[in-house]
Amino acid sequence: MAFGPDGILFVGDSVGATVLALDTDDRKSAKSGGSFELKGVNTKIAALLGTEPDQILIQDVAVNPLSKKVYISVSRGRGPDAVPVILRADSSGKITELSLDKIKHSTVSLPNAPDPSAKDRRGQSLRLETITDLAFVDGKLIVAGLSNEEFASTLRSIPFPFAEAGTGAGIEIFHGAHGRFETNAPVRTLVGYNINNKPHILAAYTCTPLVTIPISELKPGSKVKGATIAELGNRNRPLDMIVYNKDGKDYVLMANSSRGVMKLPAARLDSYEPITAQTDKQGVPYETIASLKGVQQLDKFDDAQALMLTDDGGSLDLGTIALP
């Protein structure tokens, strides 16, 4: 999920190979200086949906930048029969379901998604990777994921209001940890950022290359080579990434499956020589924020705070923290 302008919530449907734009009608600006805390959100959601905590899966969270309400994508049940639900939580802790019955919406189809029967070498469905992340950047929706093209790793730049999605751009990167060029690994998380006053995508991949890609090159049918500006360590999956400014300097904050939460300087990202040889760690330096543990989801809350979903011994907690 990702928010666009005026309370529009973009939701990806990999199985259906579509992206929905939902008008949440949630445009009232929140007062500045607020925070958010909701402990045991998995238990509260399970009670709301009439099931047990082990029968729900929180897929994503997104903060409405206007109202500061938190939108939560949930699967009720496990496996192929799981039912998707979108919930909305406010600062008082109240959770309600976002009714989709009469909601104003538009959709765009992704024409060259992986076949529903396609599997990777581990036997996992490639169709479920049709959409791996979304970001609204410079008036366009950027959709990361896989396609059925030769360069399966795909980024689509889709104008909003929606026009046709097109086939997207095939992405090639050099993966330093693997020592080779790759075209089949999908972007796991991305964020928009201006480099030399030009809109770029910062994209992170499994095991953990960090790559810059100019948005202007994301034309349907094109093949684009990203610049790998950092290798942040293998055996890791990046989960979420935000950009923020603190004390006049820009930073990237990245949550990871097994390497904690990383803080990286965003200044002069174009000054790092692209990685083109096998390496373990190289490029943009980072520090690990030792106090942030068990982070599963991350989004920007406001200019001073981030929202995190953390696992505290089985209890999933939603809360804001001061940006480090």
What positions do the PLM features span?
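Sequence/structural signature of beta-propeller domains
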Residues: 2-324
